[in-house]
Amino acid sequence: MNKIITIIPISSFNNSKTRLSPFLSESERTNLLKVMLKDIVSNIQDHVSDIIVTSKDEYVLNYAKYLNLNVFKEKEHEHDFLNNAISDAISYISKNYDNYSVMILPADIPLFNSRNMKYILKNRDDFIISPSKGGGTNLLYINREYNYKPLFGAFSFFKHVQEAKNNNLDVNIYDSFYLSLDVNTPEDLGEILLHGRNTHTYNYLSNLNIGVESNHGKERLYVYRKNE
């Protein structure tokens, strides 16, 4: 059975998640990213052989080391930073590991849980992919050697599926609410408060006195600061 090597790309902790800036301060958003990463790591670390955080931000890399993760410093590129960073990390893995599968996860899916991980371990298809809301990719598992080209960005889910089919891979589309939720808006924070009670992220948001109520308006959830 191949070892699973997980890649988690993180561009920066600073000035991140700007769509949350009207609701959370910059330091609060930085700490949010940290606790979300802790949630992902805590749910996969017993099931994978290695976790590699790739970034060019020394702050991110140092925090990853603090969590006892391996790091890969992102190389300089003129464009398409995320996809080039992932390609470089995969190349690094191919030179330093034998008999491996690659799993790529974003750092902002704190509802990813051990049941999701066990699904990956049970199925081990050539290519497992989970869509995000809006057509992105929130999990990519590659269990066969081929010249994989990362296609993250707008509507990447459909591009990744087509690329896998073009390479004659058996594609398993793993549709999971918990994997689909990447955190970008206050409403997403509300979903964490509803569905993520056993997570570091839930505890962090609760300590910020953030509350959630059902809403019958444009947004399904009303998310608010209790002290305001």
From Swiss-Prot:
Coiled coil stretches, renumbered: none
Pfam families in the cross-refs: CofC (PF01983)
Entry keyword set: GTP-binding, Nucleotide-binding, Nucleotidyltransferase, Transferase
InterPro entries: CofC (IPR002835), Nucleotide-diphossugar_trans (IPR029044)
EC assignment: 2.7.7.68
Catalytic reaction(s) noted: (2S)-2-phospholactate + GTP + H(+) = (2S)-lactyl-2-diphospho-5'-guanosine + diphosphate
GO terms, molecular function: GTP binding; phospholactate guanylyltransferase activity
Gene3D superfamilies associated with the record: Spore Coat Polysaccharide Biosynthesis Protein SpsA, Chain A (3.90.550.10)
Broad EC category: transferase
UniProt keyword Nucleotidyltransferase, yes or no: yes
Record's subunit section: Homodimer.
Alphabetized PANTHER family for the sequence: 2-PHOSPHO-L-LACTATE GUANYLYLTRANSFERASE (PTHR40392:SF1)
Role played: Guanylyltransferase that catalyzes the activation of (2S)-2-phospholactate (2-PL) as (2S)-lactyl-2-diphospho-5'-guanosine, via the condensation of 2-PL with GTP. It is involved in the biosynthesis of coenzyme F420, a hydride carrier cofactor.
Family affiliation: Belongs to the CofC family.
Descriptive protein name: 2-phospho-L-lactate guanylyltransferase
Organism: Methanosphaera stadtmanae (strain ATCC 43021 / DSM 3091 / JCM 11832 / MCB-3)
